[in-house]
């Protein structure tokens, strides 16, 4: 369901449930669904916290966070809807980062081009992308010796280029394949085996990709896109 608000589909779920049309919520809890699968928020927060500490080498780094928005007219309360990452995850990472500044942009490359001088003035800083769509156009991130690290929350196939080239140091993302596997297994139990799901809820650990294990990242996307 991410990034759809669960409330937007609950009316339809309520309509279908009496008609023996079972629904599993993935990425968001849905009222009326027979079960739910998502990411363990505590595990996500722990992993991101460890990564930010590792990437900064435990030094004080000025973090700059980027939200994704596809419209300059969108309100701050709505800007986080345009993401394959949940709002709870975004807010959790933003708090952990304790950003010096936050920006809402449609493309990091466009922002970097327009604010090249501002970026050059930064010292000892980290960049945190709170949506992989910020890097979807595959424009390389300009090298900067003052940039300590670049981190992304969420995943798209395009990030392979950034990870392989060392432009992105770390990416933490949801196990979408695991979500789908749980959902299909649950539906098979309900529809084929005619029994209630063995699990009402399944929380999976987040995945992590770095330049060192980028092959694993590619394999994840290869099986997701089959």
Descriptions of predicted regions:
Residues 1-18, 92, 100-162:
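Hydrophobic alpha-helical
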Residues 6-43, 156-164, 168:
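Flexible loop/hinge segments that line or gate small-molecule binding clefts
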Residues 14-21, 50-57, 139-140, 164, ...:
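Sec-exported extracytoplasmic/periplasmic mature domains
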Residues 31-39, 69-72, 124-125, 170-173:
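Second-shell loop/turn segments in exported
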Residues 36-63, 76-77, 155-160, 174-195:
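Hydrophobic alpha-helical segments within soluble ligand-binding/sensing domains
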